[in-house]
């Protein structure tokens, strides 16, 4: 076995694709296994910004979605070919955006083939060009180091038994698979070899054939009927399947079947559903075959958790678990006692033996009702509290939605705008939420924009540090191009009915604050953003449909998925009364102010801010900067790369471009040394009575980069009134960073590594590279305070 290539596709540091080459057993052929990073499959079917070229805007895709792929060189045709081809990666209901019921109803069409999801490990059976059968697991062949017998070995033994039962040979099967150019896909279920969640003993052991895939990059697979016929001809175990015509019929059946986790009186893990799709992320396929799965949540979620905590216990680690807390704690106590009495049980368990018998022994001794146990522990012990977390910008209607729900169900609304700003604000917000939980409320609305990624994850961290069992429900408001103008008009019509944004203090000020939020906004992206990955539920809302309809969406989602939280089904009159309360009766009484105490001398200007006048700006800026149009910066970058004969994807793909671009003129951290210059900026803003402080033009002189950050170095137009009144020795535009851990201000350190004489430059660091920008490129932006 040799490890070969590692390829990055979506700009991440870790490899998207890795390859390992194996010597095929009893053959002269080498087969290369291609393993794709699991998160990349999720990215590939998402609209994450990582899936789009930052310069051209074209969609970036994986070369194939195959999960389980082996290639080899065919000496006869003198070309590389796919020898083993697994399924395209498919997802559970609600696991990714394209497998929500709403999405499936739009991009899939029937008939829907349901196949029972057998509970084992996947085995691939294919043929080498020389007519030999090859059997593999998902990513390996033959003997695996550290194992006395591998999955592929056991799979091949079962294959021989199945073929013998119908008087067939491996050579005959190889000939048939070569003729079809297909891979047979089966589930190895054998408790004598390895236990999983469901039992497979006696005559139920063997290879369950559930797929025949064409050996090509696109996903082309045989129907369940063809697979069943093939299984019968070649002696495999058959997988039960049946059809449903509509998505609505399918959904009703699956939700009913999940109540007891059985089908035809047999406990099963769930179903795999096969259909056809026209989703845009699958456009590269010539086929439109599409799979998704419906795994019964109970009791198998609890069984999987028990398996994991048991292995932690045996390994000497402290068992960590988030659901079914009460019964899992009892199960761990039982296992601890059992293993102290029987050391062999530990050894067998780590070899995946005795898993089911240990679990069954605990259930019998505890005399527990299995389905009632798992459901009640999930809802009561696992997630006792529910927090609604909007992801929005100003004016989307989140407070109105919150107040409608408060009126309907008594769910308290914790408003960040009702809490003092300043240091420790996020923790105060979290503590206020926890206080409501401790006061006996099971649902709380976290009324804050949560528009920045780390705000969303920090909120979870701060709350879970103080209280267990919180279910986090994300409420992302759509942020389409027409939303900013729509919500801006809504805010202006609202007037002064807000704790901190008062239209009477100036329309320009309101627009400036809103623009700052737009620039900071990071879309909710559980597939591509680690800060968003741990939310339990997602309910998409839309500012354009109105707050009442958004409130109905939340209620309808809860009725379907968390019905115990909806004590009564509101009538139309109830909704109308709640809307009237939220819009007409509720009036914010708290006045949130920023900056210095307004009792100080009227219109006093200090290095901290401007106070006293209602039309001035009481909150001290973080910095003053020139805000630049994103498209202008990107087109300038394209121009520079074109002249240098460089391609972004080839030379700079490791960097992720910034969401917005600016040139920092002076930062609040520079006030102690440069207070006089800071006060000049404040005075200018005060005199103009607006945050729009005038346009400034710059010349882009160099493109500079190292392994962490890439930026433009710029110089200011000498005719500007601000020329010479900046505190950055090298003005610049940070273009991108190599990871989310790298901060944009590192451009300052990067430029310090170069020796500058006017526009002439000399590198003192071999890791720093640069391009001189010629001919001249001029870029212009608006000087504004940034809060």
From Swiss-Prot:
The active site is at 117 (n6-amp-lysine intermediate). GO terms for molecular function: 2',3'-cyclic-nucleotide 3'-phosphodiesterase activity; ATP binding; GTP-dependent polyribonucleotide 5'-hydroxyl-kinase activity; RNA ligase (ATP) activity. It catalyses: ATP + (ribonucleotide)n-3'-hydroxyl + 5'-phospho-(ribonucleotide)m = (ribonucleotide)n+m + AMP + diphosphate. It is an enzyme of class 6 (ligase). Keywords: Cytoplasm, Ligase, tRNA processing. Its EC number is 6.5.1.3. It holds the Pfam family tRNA_lig_kinase. GO terms for biological process: tRNA splicing, via endonucleolytic cleavage and ligation. GO terms for cellular component: cytosol; nucleus. Its main location: cytoplasm. Gene3D superfamilies: P-loop containing nucleotide triphosphate hydrolases. It is found in: Cytoplasm. Belongs to the TRL1 family. Has three domain each corresponding to an enzymatic activity, namely in N- to C-terminal order: ligase, kinase and cyclic phosphodiesterase (CPDase). Required for the splicing of precursor tRNA molecules containing introns. The ligation activity requires three enzymatic activities: phosphorylation of the 5' terminus of the 3' half-tRNA in the presence of ATP, opening of the 2'3'-cyclic phosphodiester bond of the 5' half-tRNA leaving a 2'-phosphomonoester and ligation of the two tRNA halves in an ATP-dependent reaction. This is tRNA ligase 1. It comes from Schizosaccharomyces pombe (strain 972 / ATCC 24843) (Fission yeast). The lineage of its organism: Eukaryota, Fungi, Dikarya, Ascomycota, Taphrinomycotina. The gene is trl1.
